[in-house]
């Protein structure tokens, strides 16, 4: 029996982006660009528009049992500010993937190439910063 080839972190990330692109297109978004290699700390992985709105989409994908997470408050703020500079709304997509062939917890969490995956995606979260407090 041959050894299974595993997806790299970069391939898992790109897979999540591909999944989100399909979902966005189904929802009427026109995709302008998609870059799995974008600097994850400062730039969106997908840029699109719909009904006059520009959307910057920050995507994170993790293997079962996890879900993609933003790497801290500074990254969150950088993404929102970057979108704002371009007149765009900023959205976060957290995806989790599990090997459909996996029967055990370990097998579900192993990123094997060439198998089907179950996708966990609860929708987009609009990212925003709190309004500054006004003091008198």
Set out the residue ranges of the language-model regions.
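Acidic-basic catalytic patches of nuclease active cores, encompassing PD-(D/E)XK
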Residues: 1-35
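Histidine (H) residue identity feature
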Residues: 13, 18, 49, 82, ...
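Amphipathic coiled-coil/heptad-repeat helices and related helical stalk/stem segments
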Residues: 17, 42, 75-76
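A short beta-turn/loop motif at secondary-structure boundaries
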Residues: 36-40
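Short acidic loop-to-beta-strand element that houses the catalytic metal-binding Asp/Glu
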Residues: 43-48
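Catalytic cores of nucleic-acid endonucleases
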Residues: 49, 53-55, 59-112
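Glycine-rich, aromatic-bearing surface loops/beta-hairpins
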Residues: 108-136
């Amino acid at each position: 029996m041959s050894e299974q080839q595993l997806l790299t972190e970069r391939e898992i990330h790109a897979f999540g982006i591909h999944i989100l692109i399909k979902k966005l297109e189904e929802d009427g978004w026109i995709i302008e660009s998609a870059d799995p290699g974008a600097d994850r700390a400062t730039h969106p992985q997908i840029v699109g528009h719909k009904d006059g709105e520009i959307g910057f989409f920050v995507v994170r994908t993790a293997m079962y049992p996890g879900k993609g997470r933003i790497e801290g408050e500074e990254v969150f703020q950088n993404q929102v500010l970057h979108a704002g500079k371009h007149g765009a709304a900023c959205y976060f997509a957290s995806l989790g993937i599990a090997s459909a062939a996996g029967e055990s917890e370990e097998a579900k969490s192993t990123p094997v190439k060439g198998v089907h995956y179950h996708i966990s995606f609860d929708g987009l979260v609009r990212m925003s910063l709190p309004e500054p407090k006004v003091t008198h």
